[in-house]
């Protein structure tokens, strides 16, 4: 080991090139100047815009459950499960992903309100689906709630329209 290191040192001093190979030989010889020229040519100038303080469009998340949601859900569960349905349809298990998808897709299309991805794992039975679709969703952002609330006299929120 010591002999190999000594040979390299002697080779460098004599200029024999026994040491490490130059970087250009290892990586194709590209220089940083060439890379900078290519990058400068590929950059497209973008216009800087002022941040917009316009009120964002309202999201269509509002959902009011229909009065007959239980009968709608019962009909869909019986339609999908067929004759294999147990006595109590609310206890119908949704462990089969195909069954769960069919039920939730039909309800989302019919009611216009889909189960978000973050809550799909919570839908284990028809009772869970009934609980989700029985819960109303209001369509107000926090800023809208602040505008509607009684604020102190030194605080006012106004959107540019």
Swiss-Prot record:
It comes from the Eukaryota. Its main location: mitochondrion. GO terms for cellular component: cytosol; mitochondrial large ribosomal subunit. Disulfide bonds: none annotated. Pfam families: Ribosomal_L50. Residues 27-51 are annotated as: Disordered. It is found in: Mitochondrion. Keywords: Mitochondrion, Ribonucleoprotein, Ribosomal protein. The keyword Membrane does not apply. Belongs to the mitochondrion-specific ribosomal protein mL50 family. Component of the mitochondrial ribosome large subunit (39S) which comprises a 16S rRNA and about 50 distinct proteins. This is Large ribosomal subunit protein mL50. It comes from Gallus gallus (Chicken). The lineage of its organism: Eukaryota, Metazoa, Chordata, Craniata, Vertebrata. The gene is MRPL50.
């Amino acid at each position: 080991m010591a002999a190999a290191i000594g040979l390299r040192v002697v080779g460098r001093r004599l200029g024999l090139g026994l040491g490490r190979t130059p970087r250009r030989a290892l990586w194709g010889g590209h220089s940083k100047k060439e890379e900078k020229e290519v990058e400068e040519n590929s950059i497209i100038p973008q216009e800087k815009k002022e941040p917009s303080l316009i009120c964002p469009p309202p999201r269509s998340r509002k959902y009011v459950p229909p009065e007959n949601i239980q009968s709608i859900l019962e009909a869909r569960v019986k339609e999908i499960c067929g004759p294999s349905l147990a006595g109590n349809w609310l206890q119908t298990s949704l462990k089969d992903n195909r069954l769960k998808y069919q039920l939730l897709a039909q309800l989302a299309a019919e009611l216009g309100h889909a189960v978000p991805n973050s809550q799909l794992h919570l839908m284990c039975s028809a009772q869970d689906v009934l609980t989700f679709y029985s819960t109303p969703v209001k369509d107000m952002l926090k800023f809208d709630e602040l505008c509607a609330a009684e604020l102190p006299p030194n605080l006012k929120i106004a959107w540019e329209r």
